[in-house]
């Protein structure tokens, strides 16, 4: 344990606020709620980590820094947006981030074939199609920069979620269960029911992941004592 008051979860560690500044250390880029797909995602991150750590660019006159590759960000940012959809809500800021990732991409057939194969194996194909629909319809992204064919049905659903809920679901009038712990969990189930038609693997696994994560936190909290 680094300090007596940090809170660890599967994705990050929250440290106590220091002079009003919240500190959250991410030790895992992202995760998926479907256990099968998440296992593949973590293997993917493990396989490309050395490339990401060694990918360096010049930051003006400030020197050299390491940043992820565009190819990595295409998957990482997509899973980050997906997590927002499944858990609380997406804001336009996440979608705008993805627009700029796509804008930086130099498309070639070999890279696109590899990327599309990865998206299918990770269970992200339909969600990627939904995001491509929004990129084209809302942000005016040229078709030549889309990484998968746009999925209008799923895209319209996701766009409606963005407009109804906003970032972290702060503006979602459908939140009807209050802000208590019980209300929060009931709201998650209600959300899963709404999402299961479009993204069944993630929505069906969400309650089981939540139970698994509860015991994961208990186990790792006891190990840090």
Language model features: what each stretch is:
Residues 2-225:
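Conserved NTP-donor binding/palm subdomain of two-metal-ion nucleotidyltransferases/polymerases, i.e.
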């Amino acid at each position: 344990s680094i300090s007596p008051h940090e809170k660890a979860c599967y994705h990050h560690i929250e440290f106590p606020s220091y002079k009003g500044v919240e500190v959250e250390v991410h030790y895992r880029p992202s995760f998926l709620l479907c256990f099968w797909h998440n296992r593949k995602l973590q293997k993917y991150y493990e396989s490309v980590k050395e490339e990401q750590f060694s990918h360096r660019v010049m930051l003006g006159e400030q020197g050299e820094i390491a940043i992820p590759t565009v190819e990595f960000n295409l998957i990482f940012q997509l899973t980050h947006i997906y997590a927002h959809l499944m858990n609380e809500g997406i804001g336009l800021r996440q979608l705008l981030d993805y627009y700029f990732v796509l804008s930086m991409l130099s498309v070639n057939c070999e890279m696109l074939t590899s990327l599309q194969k990865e998206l299918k194996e990770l269970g992200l194909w339909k969600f990627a199609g939904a995001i491509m629909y929004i990129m084209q319809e809302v942000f005016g992204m040229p078709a030549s920069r889309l990484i998968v064919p746009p999925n209008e049905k799923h895209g319209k659903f996701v766009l409606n979620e963005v407009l109804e809920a906003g970032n972290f679901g702060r503006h979602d009038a459908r939140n009807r269960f209050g802000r208590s712990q019980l209300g929060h969990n009931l709201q998650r189930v209600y959300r899963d029911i709404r999402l299961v038609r479009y993204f069944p693997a993630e929505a069906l696994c969400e309650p089981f992941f939540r139970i698994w994560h509860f015991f994961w936190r208990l186990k790792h909290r006891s190990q840090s004592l």
